[in-house]
Curated annotation (Swiss-Prot):
Residues annotated for ATP binding in this entry: 230-236
The keyword Zinc is annotated on this UniProt entry: no
Active site (record annotation): 86 (nucleophile), 176, 178
Catalytic activity as recorded in UniProt: XMP + L-glutamine + ATP + H2O = GMP + L-glutamate + AMP + diphosphate + 2 H(+)
Protein's name in the database: GMP synthase [glutamine-hydrolyzing]
Pfam families linked: GATase, GMP_synt_C, NAD_synthase
An annotated GO cellular component: cytosol
Species for this entry: Allorhizobium ampelinum (strain ATCC BAA-846 / DSM 112012 / S4)
Length: 520
């Protein structure tokens, strides 16, 4: 996260909503930079960022409770535009002289707004007398609005669904404009950012790239950087950005643990060495990893073994290089946002990649994290800006522990080889059908189950392969992809005919929730 003021930015105060990150995504989609800060440190964040507008998130808390989160007075005193969402509306009303009460009718899900008065925020979007779908999720409700406010829209259970004090540029809604279930929500946020706050949408990846290169050079100086290259989008984009900044001062290490997709390690090495002229060390550690994983069936034990072996292997290679002062990582913004706790202070949740967790402390290195202000979709845009091919940028997500967690039960070399072939055929059929970009993630799973089959004149007793494909926006929720049966039949036939060791194929039709996307 930036440590300095950022011109033309928006500050988002997080009161603990599960969808606060969606607010940030909507703001950035308008070409405007924003940051999320927990309510406990909102004054410091406000002073540091020096934003031109403030958005208040929802919350699981009740504005009626003693000690519930509040907006610092300095923000109201600043004269900046404020947009309160759900709990954000309730705390505005509670703090500025309105009234909030526990709702007798909790309102969750789809609702319809009736537009009663016009305002600048509605320009080019809504008109008086029109009706629009929104998404509600609240128990408490506003029952009296503060002096200076007027009601702009109502719903059947929320008589103050949309209120505003246009003189002070305060807008507050009971619904959630940031979610896709409010069709006009993104445009509302855009109107607030551009029309009300007057911020120009000129934040771009090319500008971010130039700034990041400058910051990396200032941080690293003439020192050396090593970067763990996994072959994924995040670590690859981070490595290219660092390389653009410091050139030969960067060395990348690709630890090949034998758990990647078919030909993946070779393809990554070829791309980075030949096309980008990166100093890349390819470590063949397949025997080391697979040897220790053989027979291990517990998913968490698999992860711990992979993480430990990666650190050991990486340390050994780094020592051969004579060490380095900095470690490059592809940490993203969702990994560093502070989560909000109502039982105490904020707890910082760093979702350390299984490969690099603990490396900086163990090796006495400082971190270079050039992507820590970006969301995943923004990293893909930056990757394109840096010249990575669309076929690489648009690849489906792949888990850190790789194929080890797509082999439920014990891992063996034979099972990994069988799975790798089945997965490659499945993805090939998806691409041939023109479905790859319509699916968020697709993969094969080799089940620890063998079944009887008949192939030719002989009886077989071989593994079952499960195929998985989901649609999703961010991986938090997902629905199984609805293939036609002809496609599934074609993919299954190829896998059974071409992969020795599989005689039955099934398709997973579980959504998330209740299931998860991966099987382990």
């Amino acid at each position: 996260m930036t440590q300095t003021a950022h011109p033309d930015s928006v500050l988002i105060i997080d009161f603990g909503s599960q969808v606060t990150q969606l607010i940030a995504r909507r703001v950035r989609e308008t070409g405007v930079y924003c940051e999320i800060v927990p309510f406990q440190s909102s004054e410091e964040g406000f002073a540091r960022l020096k934003p031109k507008a403030v958005i208040l998130s929802g919350s699981p808390a009740s504005a009626l409770d003693e000690g519930s989160p509040r907006v610092p007075q300095v923000i109201f005193d600043s004269g900046l535009p404020i947009f309160g969402i759900c709990y954000g509306q309730q705390t505005i009303c509670a703090q500025l002289g309105g009234k909030v009460e526990a709702g007798h009718h909790r309102e969750f899900g789809r609702a319809f707004l009736e537009i009663e008065q016009d305002c600048k925020l509605f320009e080019g979007l809504w008109s008086v007398g029109s009706r629009h779908q929104v998404w509600m999720s609240h128990g408490d409700r506003v029952t009296a609005i503060p002096p200076g406010f007027r009601v702009l829209a109502t719903s059947s259970n929320a008589p103050f669904a949309f209120i505003a004090d246009e003189a002070r540029k305060y807008y507050a809604v009971q619904f959630h404009p940031e979610v896709v279930h409010t069709p006009d929500g993104a445009k509302l946020i855009q109107n607030f950012v551009h029309n009300i706050a007057g911020i120009t949408g000129d934040w771009s990846m090319s500008a971010y790239r130039a700034k990041a290169v400058e910051q990396i050079r200032a941080q690293v100086g003439d020192k050396r950087v090593i970067c763990a290259l996994s072959g994924g989008v995040d670590s690859s984009v981070a490595a290219l950005l660092i390389h653009e900044a410091v050139g030969d001062q960067l060395t990348c290490i690709l630890v090949d643990h034998g758990l990647m997709r078919k030909n993946e390690a070779a393809d990554v090495v070829a791309m980075f060495k030949e096309h980008y002229n990166l100093h890349l060390i390819h470590v063949d550690a397949i025997d080391r990893f697979v040897g220790e994983l053989e027979g291990v069936s517990d998913p968490e034990t698999k992860r711990k073994i992979i993480g430990r072996l990666f650190i050991e292997t990486f340390e050994e290679e780094a020592k051969k290089l004579g060490g380095a002062d900095f470690l490059g990582q592809g940490t993203l913004y969702p990994d560093v946002i502070e989560s909000v706790s109502f039982s105490g202070g904020p707890s910082v949740t760093i979702k350390s990649h299984h490969n690099v967790g603990g490396l900086p402390d163990r090796m006495n290195m400082k971190l270079v994290e050039p992507l820590r202000e970006l969301f995943k979709d923004e990293v893909r845009v930056l990757g394109k800006e840096l010249g990575l091919p669309d076929s690489f940028i648009g690849r489906h997500p792949f888990p850190g522990p790789g194929l080890a967690i797509r082999c439920p039960g014990g891992v063996t070399r034979e099972k990994l080889d069988i799975l790798r072939e089945a997965d490659a055929i499945y993805l090939d059929e998806i691409r041939k059908a023109g479905l790859y970009d319509a699916i968020w993630q697709a993969f094969a799973v080799l089940l620890p189950v063998q079944t009887v089959g008949v192939m030719g004149d002989g009886r077989t007793y071989e593994f079952v392969c499960a195929l998985r494909a989901v649609t999703s926006v961010d991986g938090m929720t997902a629905d199984f992809y609805h293939y036609d049966m002809e496609f599934l039949g074609r993919a299954a036939t190829r896998i059974i005919n071409e992969v020795r060791g599989i005689n039955r194929v099934v398709y997973d039709v579980t959504s998330k929730p209740p299931g998860t996307i991966e099987w382990e």
